[in-house]
Amino acid sequence: MDIIFYHPTFDTQWWIEVLRKAIPQARVRAWKSGDNDSADYALVWHPPVEMLAGRDLKAVFALGAGVDSILSKLQAHPEMLKPSVPLFRLEDTGMGEQMQEYAVSQVLHWFRRFDDYRIQQNSSHWQPLPEYHREDFTIGILGAGVLGSKVAQSLQTWRFPLRCWSRTRKSWPGVQSFAGREELSAFLSQCRVLINLLPNTPATVGIINQQLLEKLPDGAYLLNLARGVHVVEDDLLAALDSGKVKGAMLDVFNREPLPPESPLWQHPRVTITPHVAAITCPAEAVDYISRTIAQLEKGERVCGQVDRARGY
């Protein structure tokens, strides 16, 4: 069994050594331009077209939760990956717990009005503020996949009213489910906090725009943990300036790194992190990949395969 590996920033040698220990029967090598030798599996992140084109692979593993970079390249270069080759993504591998930490910490930050107290501190102003009531602080999760379900589970501990919106209806205990475009307005109408965990597909690009933001309650909050292309940044800035949106915590952006001239940097109601909400945990990723390859070799059914038409 031959495995090729490519990641533009990971410690390639570490990955190769750990993969060799986890899959001792495999010959694992770092892919370099010009390497056209045979391979059974490819482990990749933002791979060059040349790496995958024309190969008779058993499977490709994207080393992250999103596969939009591969799918966008496939649109421009359909020869990059044969339709018969299954594409897998890392559904969790430690990222779910990181998303839980990020989401819960920020929701509590807003619920306890720490954002307001920070602004008061900046002007040396001492003024206790009325508390928010938990029953009025509904959390809405856009996107009800693996990571969305993890975030919902963690927020249930804090007894916030929860709702989710997705393409198809979900049956999550304690979470009100909305499905389809026809139910999006009803979903948004009660969301004091909107957490975006949607996949990046043509149908979701620019979905968080003026029209969507206007359907939120006045003074709502936005937490974007998915992709920058989901948000029309000018529309968000306008909503922040008008007070329609009271605050935004943004981990992802249309352009990354976020340009220094972006007005988001200096906005008093925006908090920025550099795409770190959930980072691939190497040890857990290797465990998932090695188990999945073993299942594929035995002809067993596996989880995490991407539906290329849907984009996730």
From Swiss-Prot:
* Primary localization class, coarse: cytoplasm
Q: Which molecular function term from Gene Ontology is one that the record holds? A: hydroxypyruvate reductase (NADPH) activity
Q: Could you state one GO cellular component term attached to this entry?
A: cytosol
* Keyword Transit peptide in record: no
Q: What is its EC number?
A: 1.1.1.79, 1.1.1.81
Q: Which reaction does it catalyse?
A: glycolate + NADP(+) = glyoxylate + NADPH + H(+); (R)-glycerate + NAD(+) = 3-hydroxypyruvate + NADH + H(+); (R)-glycerate + NADP(+) = 3-hydroxypyruvate + NADPH + H(+)
- Enzyme active site: R227, H275 (proton donor)
Q: What is its EC class?
A: oxidoreductase
Keywords on this record? Cytoplasm, NAD, NADP, Oxidoreductase
Compartment(s) = Cytoplasm
Is the keyword Magnesium assigned to this protein? no
Checking InterPro entries in the record gives:
D-isomer_DH_CS, D-isomer_DH_NAD-bd, GhrA_Enterobacterales, NAD(P)-bd_dom_sf
Q: Which Pfam families match?
A: 2-Hacid_dh_C (PF02826)
Q: Which HAMAP family match?
A: 2_Hacid_dh_C_GhrA (MF_01666)
> What does the sequence similarity comment in the record state about its family?
Belongs to the D-isomer specific 2-hydroxyacid dehydrogenase family. GhrA subfamily.
Describe the function of this protein. Catalyzes the NADPH-dependent reduction of glyoxylate and hydroxypyruvate into glycolate and glycerate, respectively.
Q: What is this protein called?
A: Glyoxylate/hydroxypyruvate reductase A
The gene behind this protein is ghrA
